Every structure is written in C-alpha cells, then in structure tokens.
Amino acid sequence: MMNDIKVMNHAADNIRILAASMVEKANSGHPGGAMGGSDFINVLFSEYLVYDPADPTWTGRDRFFLDPGHMSPMLYAGLALRGFFSMEDLKQFRQWGSVTPGHPELDLERGIENSSGPLGQGHALAAGAAVAEKFLEARLGSTMMQHKIYAYISDGAVEEEISQGVGRIAGNLGLNNLIMFYDSNDIQLSTECGVVMNEDTEMKYKAWGWNVIKINGNDVAQIREALDAAQKEQDRPTLIIGKTVMGKGALRADGTSYEACINTHGAPLGGDAYVNTIKHLGGDPENAFVIFDDVKEIYAKRAEELKKIVAERKAAEAEWRKANPEKAALMDEWFSGKAPKVDWSKVEQKAGSATRAASAACLGVLAEQVPNMICASADLSNSDKTDGFLKKTKSIVRGDFSGAFFQAGVAELTMADMCIGMMLHGGVVAAMGTFFVFSDYMKPAVRIAALMQVPVKFIWTHDAFRVGEDGPTHEPVEQEAQIRLMEKLKNHAGKDSVRVFRPADADETTVCWKLAMENVETPTALIFSRQGIAKLPEGTDYEQAAKGAYIVAGSDENPDVILVASGSEVSTLEAGCEALRADGIKVRVVSAPSEGLFRGQSKEYQESVLPKNAKIFGMTAGLPVTLEGLVGANGKVWGLESFGFSAPYKVLDEKLGYTGENVYKQVKAFLAEA
C-alpha cells in the first residue's frame, strides 16, 4: 500500500529543508537542483528501491547512480531518511574529514554506488552496471540477478557528449533493467538551458530505442506511475523525463518566489531567503536538521517492508545455492574482489612479435580461464588485438548476454565509463582497448576510476611514432608522460592511483598482464606496440618486471653507463650495446615497464638497479620528461620533442634517431661530457 500523498510531499519538503540547510551551513554548494529533485528521490527511496538496510553490499540490491554530483545534498538527505547518515553528518557537509564531501564519493556502506561530479559519467557508469547485471544473469540466472539499475541525470549530463554514447549503446542493447530519471528543470549554472539547447530530448532517446515517459517530476502520483511502467518494461531502457522546478519551495528575502532562478543553482539561498524558505517548507530555521515524525514513519515502514522483501529474496537465493553449488562457488569467487586464478603457463608467445599480438595471446587465455571477464573495444578489436579475446567468445548483443565481448563502437569515453560501471556493479572483471593516442578521449574516466580505486584494465596499443604512415594525428608522443603522472598521484589509500606497464617484448607482456590481473586495488594501463620487437637477451628474468624495473640479461658488472627504457626502446638500446662494448665500455641495460612499481621497491633495490651517482642514458619514444625521473640529475634522455610524421616506421626510426647506431653515438657523446 502506497503512502499518503500529503505525507510524501512532506517528506520531499523534509529533504529540501535538509539540502538547503546543508548548503547554508557550509556556505557552499548547490541547493536549487537538490530541492527540485527531492520528490523523485523520496518516491524512489521510500517505495521502490530494493536494498537491505542491514547489508548494504548485498549483491541482489537495486543500485542507484547519481550523475550530477553537485546535487549531493539531495542524495545525503535522502540517505539520511534511510538511516545511512546522521544529522551531524549532514551538518559537516563539505568539511575536512567528513563523510559528506561536496560531491559524493564511492561509499557502499552508506548507499553511495559511485563517485560523481564530472557530468555525464555517472549515468555511463549506471549503463555499465546494467550490462554487468545482464551478463551475470546469463550465467547465474534470474534468482540471483533480478535487480534494477537506477540513474539520475540532469540537463548538464544530457548536454555532455557522453550522453550520445550511453543513449546509443543502452538502446541498442535493450537494457530494460536500466531506469533513468532526467531531472529537466531547464536551469544550469550560468544560463537557462534554452540558451544552449533546443533539441527534442524525448524524440532523441526514442530514436535510440528507449522507452520515454514524460511527467511532472514534482508530482508523486506521476512519478509512481512512471516507475511502475519502467519496471514492467521488457525490451528497452526507460528514460523518465521529469519536468521539475529548480529551487522548488524557495522564497526570496522579500517573500516572493525564488523558484526557477539561476541564482539558486550554485550558491546558498542566504540570509532572509533561507529563513523564509525553511519556514515556507514547514521547518524551523533555528533547528532545521531534523526528520519529521511522519517522515520517520514512512521510512520505518519501508524498512519493515524491505525486511520481508529481502528475507524472501535471500531465502530463494539460499535454495538456488543448494541446487547450484558450483555456480554458487563461482559467484562468491567473482564477487570476492580477489584476483582470478589464471594458469599463465598456457600463454604461448612468439619471439619477435608486436606486444599488441603478445597481448592478444594473453587475452585468449583469459577468455578461456576467467569466465566473468568482459573485454571491450572502441571499434578496433582487429587492430588493438582485443580480438584475441573475441575469438574465444562472442559479442554481447540485444537479447543475448552470454557472450563476453562488449562492442562499444567509436566511443572511447563511454566505453571506459561503462567498463568501470561494470566493475562497480561487482562480479565482473572488465578490460577495454583502443589506440594509445585516443586515450586522450578517456582521461576523465581514467581519473574517476583512479579516484574510486576500480581495478579496470586499459589496453592501449600503437604506442609511439612507429604507427608510421598514419602520421602525427595517430602517433602518441605526450601520452605516456601524461599517464605516468597518474603513477605519481596517490589515491586516498596511499597507493599509486594507476598502475602503468609498457612491456619490452612478448614475454615481458605476459608478466605485465599477470601483474595487471593480480592488481585488484587500482586501475591498470597496459601500453603495447604496433610493430614487432626483438626478444630481450637469453636468460632475462622476466619475473623481475614485478619490481617495475630490472637489469636485462647480458649486462656487464660495474657498468660505465646504464641504459634504461621501456617498450620497444629497450631492444633499440640493446642494438647499440655491441658497438659500445667493442669500444671497451661496460654497459648495463634496464627495462623499466612500470616506474610506479619501481619506486615502490626498497631504496636498496632501486640503488642496485639505477644507482644515484651512475651515468644513466634513457631512450623514450615519448617526451624526454617520461624518463627524466629515472635517469636522475646526472642522466640524459633521448626522446621526441615534436609531433611525429607520416612515413614507414623504419624510415622514422632512422630519421628520428631510434637506431642502435644512434644509441652508440649519443652514449659516446654523453660519456665524453663527463
């Protein structure tokens, strides 16, 4: 039985009061949108969302993804009514050390499924979670996977380019488990939305294959009706376009309406406007941080309903476990967060192959041995060699999620965020590929994954100017330096925010993939070559790659000079060693696939590989700064300082100085400087 509409409106006003008061107390934040969206949040949280208050991480729960993170006061207030936050927590909004930061940060124990703020990404995460739920349902059945994924978006998210990718993919896959509320209040931070957009959003989503329902987003009955219809939808994702009022219930200092005003979007109501608003909504400005008694009742009632719903679901789950012990064991393993078990001896590598081809060999084994892994590509599977995975499975398509390859189309950012969302859902391991130069499209997703500590795998191929004939638009130069900065940035757990690997040959690629799959704490970036790379000298202990940098076999004792690189430049350094040794120069070659891992080793180990006072020469196909931290103050780096050029890659090697002969020449000159 549904709650009385008067009480529901009172509850929405309670959320409005709390949201406005949080912003007012912090003297910082966004009250207007939060006040406008309170009706939907209240209906969803008090009557529809299925979760276990006593077990917030229950795998069978519905998931709610907020996209406009600036509307955090609405989320925190709604979660406070559910018992996840105290009034003291709300009072500490945006303060040091509080559990209520300005934009929500992933916190499953308090009901927050995703960090949000950069507009557009939140609903892409939700779409990814919806794919994961369908993928797992195909393997485990509907008893264990029957939940819904709810997303909440704003005008800003619709304007963001990523909404195109999410709209297309979710519609194409028929994600009927995805229900998205579009808070359409026609106001944004600096203008009314009509200044920058005049499209028919309803028709746009219908064209993508969505079920679109348009309602008054502040009307309880219409919200219920829309949610009922969305839950019954069998073939399409649903977009509920709720026309809401920015700053609903707000009054100015003079007592006139402050609704639908740009000013309420991103600043406290302030002074008498705040006082008038709280009184108008039925609160006490002197004691605003309270939950009304009748509101407590409806949420207590929902908690009791949920006990019954969850008990029935968990009983059914227990029966399923008895009937399906092997699947149950798999499910527990998949949701454990532990690294999957892989027999890496099954990987067969071909000496001299491109590391992208070596990656394909690893992916083929992963496709066979990790049944909960999803691999994706942005329309490049036959080039980035994620087809090594695809050849052992099939693509995920509408109506059939038994495959494990996610075809994203040309949408790198959408693909990345959806893969992150798959992992946020839980139960899956996600990896995705594209050209390294197009990692630029993905940077916002890399950052949000790093912030949330989601161990997704980024596969970036065609790693340098050796892309060749395609020319500078497709030849990464600055990209490696950019992503390696993320190795230096720490997450809130004190770990390197992203683990980065650029292996030197096929066998080192296997070790790097092993390390990537074992890394369950942070995202991993794997950077691979387009062209074949000579095998490192016989006897090289590839397992040492786990230390980030290590001495390659055949290196001399007490070297006069140390040569260091990652990727294909290691073999280029090796090519210059013979001539250097013929001149009586003792040489050590160091492969450094991961500077971040290397910096995490003991000072003694670091000193044993790259002594501080040694003469160190580095070679990188990227910017010199990529290696300057490793060569140190006495070192020298040969790198690119311009964009690349269009020509066969062997011609570019000659023209740009990436040959054994130039290594000899540059090292001799470097040593002569002493």
Task: Indicate residue ranges for each PLM-predicted region.
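Non-catalytic, alpha-helical, charged scaffold/linker segments
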Residues: 278-309
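Residue-level marker for buried hydrophobic side chains located in beta-strands
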Residues: 151-152, 180, 376, 617
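Structured loop/turn residues at secondary-structure junctions
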Residues: 67, 154-155, 218, 411, ...
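Short acidic, Gly/Ser-rich segments with clustered Asp/Glu that frequently serve as metal-coordination loops
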Residues: 156-162
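Thiamine diphosphate
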Residues: 1-148, 297, 301-527, 532-534, ...
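A generic secondary-structure micro-motif detector
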Residues: 5, 65, 156, 191-192, ...
